[in-house]
Structure formats: structure tokens, C-alpha cells
């Protein structure tokens, strides 16, 4: 199978033998469907089943972290008994679960443009006609996206309704003052952190989350970009009231949320945030002892988040050193 994005067929020897059959083999075997008919958009999911001892219910994958959804890179380790092989989890109705998952992924793909354009329109409208409500509006958009990932509607109009209602409710805090706005921004970060810790699907299968065709879990580039606003605004607002340690706390929270291996797993977003925080602190404080201590504390928190979270996009890039990390970011 040729991957046009990665430049065609991979180099090296074939690791697996592939056979075609008109009937399901008795096993052990991995049975899967593959795309046929020339070039196709990478937006369809194909069936796969592992016929062997210990596999019941739906398949699980460390590559996707979504039960029932696996990546093509999982096939070879499973067939060869290597690290990174597929697992499984019990399910009374695996076919129904897979149908629901596929429908949910399709619904999110269809709703993504609607939710994004409506979100931007609401933020621009609030910034134009009610500037005091811009930060609450941002919070409303991000919290609505998280709520939609948790409740999993399959109709775009429900997504739009939840988004509008959440932003409208958030505008009630427009006149609440900078401290409340700062706490609201920090609360958005905490909500995403907790959501990814409880059930990664709440973010992964949200309208603004990953598309499940190249990136499966954590934060999408779009969502990571929107999540730049809460940490930067929250850190500055709480710093003005509570001092440098409030700034450091919000910065640490955001870096763990965005870059932590068990959470956002977005190395590029974490680097952007880190640079932004350092620039903000340097402009306000200059390069003094407090900045050095705060920066060291943030670095320690981020390192712990990467170390204890297992393998992710970020740790895989870091394993190849600075050159590999630069290639991944580029």
C-alpha cells in the first residue's frame, strides 16, 4: 500500500506475508480490509480483526488510545509478537460499539468547520461590540468543545446550539473583573487536564480535536492554538494580583496540559507556550533570580509530565534528539 503523504512505498524488506482469501481463516491471523481503486482521501476507516488467543471484544492500541480504533503501524508488532502489539477489551456488543465510534468520528469531521467558523464569528462579534467579554467568550468556546466531546452528539445543529448557549452563559462573567477572568482562564486549562486524565476521548473526539486519520489523541494543532489564549491571559491577570508564583503556577499547568505525554502530547504547542512565558516574564522582570527559579520550576514540572506519561508523540520525537525533534516540528 502506497502512502502518498510520506513519499510512496517504505524502504527495506517486507516484514509480513499478506494473503487474500474469500473466506475468514481459522486463525491465528490478522484479517483486515485495505483501500483499493487508486488514490483516495485519508478519511475512511477499514475493518480489522485479530483471530487469536486473548483477543475478545474490541481492539485497543497505544497508538490511538481510543478503544476500537487502531493504526496501521500496529499490525506488524501484533503479527510478530513485538512491543507495541494490539490488545483488546471486553465488550458485549463490539460491532455496535464500532459502528457508534465510526459514526461519531464522521459526525465530528462534518461538524468541525461549523463549530470553528461559528466560534470565530462569536469571538469577533464579542470583541467588536462587547470587548469586556472577549476572555469569557474564549472560555465558553473551549468549554463548549469539551462538553461536546463528552456528550458526543451526532448532529451539527446540536453542536452549534451548545456552543452559542455556553458562550452566552460565559458572558455573564464579562464584568467580573481581572481576577475572576484569570481564574476562569486557569479553570479552562484545569478542565482540559482533568478531562484528558479521566477519558482521553472527551478531547480526542471533540469537534475541534484530532481528526483520527494521522493524529488520534491529545490536542490537534487547531485546539492547541486556541488554548494559547487561556494560559497567557490567565498567567498575566493572576500575576498582577498574586505575584510571580501565580504566573509560574498557570505556566506549569498549561505546559503539563499541552505537552504532557498523558494529556495534550503536543510538543510544538508546549515549545510555543514556553517561549511566550519566558518572553513575558523577561519583559516584566528582566533576567533576575525570580525568573530563573520560576523557569527552573516550570522545566521540572514539564519534565516530570513527560517522564511519567509513557510513550507519546512528544517522547517519540525526543528519543531522536534535537535533530529528530526539529524534523518533527518542521
How does the language model describe each region?
Residues 175-298, 305-324:
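Generic detector of multi-pass transmembrane helix bundles and their immediately adjacent loops
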Residues 325-330:
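Long, compositionally biased charged/polar accessory segments in the mid-to-C-terminal portions
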Residues 46-49, 59-79, 101, 105, ...:
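Long, contiguous hydrophobic alpha-helical segments, chiefly transmembrane helices and signal peptides
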Residues 115-120, 293-299:
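Hydrophobic H-region at the start of alpha-helical membrane spans
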Residues 1-105:
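Soluble extramembrane regions of membrane proteins in the secretory/endomembrane system
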Residues 43, 70, 74, 142, ...:
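Generic recognition of stable, solvent-exposed alpha-helical segments in well-folded globular domains
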Residues 99-211, 224-236:
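Core alpha-helical transmembrane segments of integral membrane proteins
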Residues 67, 91-93, 113-116, 202-203, ...:
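Hydrophobic alpha-helical transmembrane segments
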Amino acid at each position: 500500500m502506497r502512502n502518498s503523504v510520506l513519499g510512496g512505498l517504505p524502504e527495506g524488506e517486507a516484514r509480513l506475508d499478506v494473503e487474500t482469501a474469500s473466506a475468514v481463516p481459522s486463525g491465528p491471523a490478522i484479517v483486515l480490509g485495505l483501500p483499493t481503486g487508486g488514490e483516495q482521501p485519508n478519511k475512511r476507516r477499514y475493518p480489522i480483526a485479530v483471530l487469536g488467543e486473548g483477543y475478545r471484544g474490541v481492539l485497543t492500541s497505544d497508538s490511538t488510545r481510543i478503544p476500537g480504533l487502531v493504526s496501521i503501524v500496529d499490525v506488524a508488532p501484533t503479527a510478530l509478537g513485538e512491543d507495541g502489539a494490539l490488545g483488546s477489551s471486553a465488550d458485549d456488543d463490539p460491532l455496535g460499539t464500532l459502528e457508534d465510534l465510526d459514526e461519531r468520528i464522521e459526525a465530528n469531521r462534518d461538524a468541525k468547520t461549523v463549530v470553528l467558523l461559528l466560534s470565530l464569528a462569536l469571538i469577533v462579534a464579542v470583541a467588536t461590540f462587547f470587548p469586556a467579554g472577549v476572555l469569557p467568550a474564549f472560555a465558553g468556546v473551549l468549554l463548549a468543545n469539551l462538553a461536546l466531546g463528552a456528550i458526543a452528539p451526532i448532529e451539527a445543529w446540536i453542536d452549534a446550539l451548545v456552543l452559542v448557549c455556553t458562550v452566552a452563559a460565559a458572558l455573564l462573567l464579562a464584568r467580573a473583573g481581572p481576577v475572576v477572568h484569570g481564574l476562569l482562564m486557569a479553570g479552562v486549562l484545569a478542565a482540559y487536564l482533568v478531562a484528558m486524565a479521566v477519558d482521553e476521548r472527551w478531547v480526542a473526539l471533540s469537534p475541534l480535536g484530532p481528526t483520527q486519520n494521522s493524529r488520534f489523541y491529545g490536542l490537534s494543532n487547531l485546539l492547541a492554538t486556541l488554548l494559547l489564549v487561556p494560559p497567557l491571559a490567565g498567567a498575566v491577570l493572576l500575576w498582577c494580583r498574586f505575584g510571580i508564583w501565580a504566573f509560574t503556577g498557570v505556566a506549569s499547568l498549561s505546559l503539563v496540559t499541552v505537552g504532557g505525554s498523558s494529556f495534550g502530547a503536543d510538543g510544538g504547542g508546549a515549545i510555543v507556550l514556553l517561549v511566550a512565558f519566558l518572553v513575558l516574564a523577561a519583559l516584566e522582570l528582566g533576567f533576575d533570580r525570580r525568573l530563573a527559579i520560576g523557569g527552573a520550576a516550570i522545566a521540572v514540572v514539564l519534565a516530570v509530565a513527560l517522564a511519567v506519561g509513557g510513550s507519546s508523540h512528544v517522547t517519540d520525537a525526543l528519543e531522536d534528539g534535537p535533530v529528530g525533534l526539529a524534523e518533527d516540528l518542521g
